[in-house]
Amino acid sequence: MQVYAVGGAIRDELLGKPSQDRDYVVVGATPAEMEAAGYRPVGKDFPVFLHPRTQEEYALARTERKTAMGYKGFAFYCEPDVTLEDDLVRRDLTINAMARAVDADGNLTGPVIDPHGGQRDLAARLFRHVSDAFAEDPVRILRLARFAARFHDFNVAAETMRLMREMVAAGEVDALVPERVWQELARGLMEARPSRMFEVLRECGALARLLPELERLWGVPQRADFHPEVDTGVHVMMVIDCAAALGAPLPVRFAALVHDLGKGTTPEDVLPRHIGHELRSVRLLEEVCARLRVPNECRDLAVVVAREHGHIHRSLELGAAAVVRLLERCDALRKPARFAQALQACEADKRGRKGFEHSDYPQAARLLAAREAAASVDAGAIARACADNVAQIKDRVHAARVEAVAQRLGAQPGE
């Protein structure tokens, strides 16, 4: 049998980038021979094995045949007569359809095997599908869009974009299961330029099918004095790219993505103002989270950011009492880490505007100081002092927090 490194490892080596992908294909072997060599079988749909020493995955070379709609509708053939070229032709993009032989010590040997022009397309910075079999798996649309967020100086070949549009029109995207959609979107959000993922999905028509709440933001105007970029869709893309530049974790990036969904449902007769968009955004993002089965950590932060980002932006103007009410609505005292993430999402929102990309965000430091002051109040001591009148506890604790915040911020308690 012969082992080859394939896909991302070869692509990244040619780009001079460190590789996170390390996939191996084994040609000329049977499952029994792999197990006899010490490999442990783990594949459910087709033969995949863990290396006995490195625990890396090794898959038998295979061909596949479409049997039904969706990304699970495939039959696989994994016999020893499947060649490396047979395996490479089933792959999605030319830049991922290259291989190099691997010796017994796991070292790459010999020339790059490139039957589909992957090196040419790397040089041209193009995403191009290997064959029309690309159309058989709708996940490939999401994967390509995710790659666009990573390799953001690449473009999609015209014939590949045309094929993706045909797939969307044929309803292939509608057959995707929610968990897989979320998995790919989440991975794309964590890339260097997440906006590119959504631009590609929008261009091929998939965004309107998967996230219509986001798609409808393009073309919706905002007040130019607050948003020089005007277009709401453009603004949201700037916000998620700013969150990426800040090194934000996934919950922050997701909150940045969905914080303004309500602007897409603002009545036309009140545009470019968006009164009440915060609560509309909460309702819409909760629908998105339910549909895509978004993790609770991401959903809960997104709700706080969508509901409170306007108040957080204006917090420099708030007195101590209003600041404490804001902290309480955000549950900042019980969940300080989530509150810090909310502030980071709001910073991305404030900076995600044309001409404001490098502006400061003093609101974050002020609110973190206020949270620290409010948290210093000994609520237990107040509760014990009010043992004979427990109805007063909540108001007394609140008043003490207002006083503590006022002292820290140099503001009047009643402001």
Swiss-Prot record:
Transmembrane segments: none annotated. It holds the Pfam family PolyA_pol. Its EC number is 2.7.7.72, 3.1.3.-, 3.1.4.-. ATP binds at residues 8, 11, 91, 143, 146. It catalyses: a tRNA precursor + 2 CTP + ATP = a tRNA with a 3' CCA end + 3 diphosphate; a tRNA with a 3' CCA end + 2 CTP + ATP = a tRNA with a 3' CCACCA end + 3 diphosphate. CTP binds at residues 8, 11, 91, 143, 146. Magnesium is required for nucleotidyltransferase activity. Nickel for phosphatase activity. Mg(2+) binds at residues 21, 23. Keywords: ATP-binding, Hydrolase, Magnesium, Metal-binding, Multifunctional enzyme, Nickel, Nucleotide-binding, Nucleotidyltransferase, RNA repair, RNA-binding, Transferase, tRNA processing. PANTHER family: MULTIFUNCTIONAL CCA PROTEIN. Comprises two domains: an N-terminal domain containing the nucleotidyltransferase activity and a C-terminal HD domain associated with both phosphodiesterase and phosphatase activities. This is Multifunctional CCA protein. It comes from Cupriavidus taiwanensis (strain DSM 17343 / BCRC 17206 / CCUG 44338 / CIP 107171 / LMG 19424 / R1).
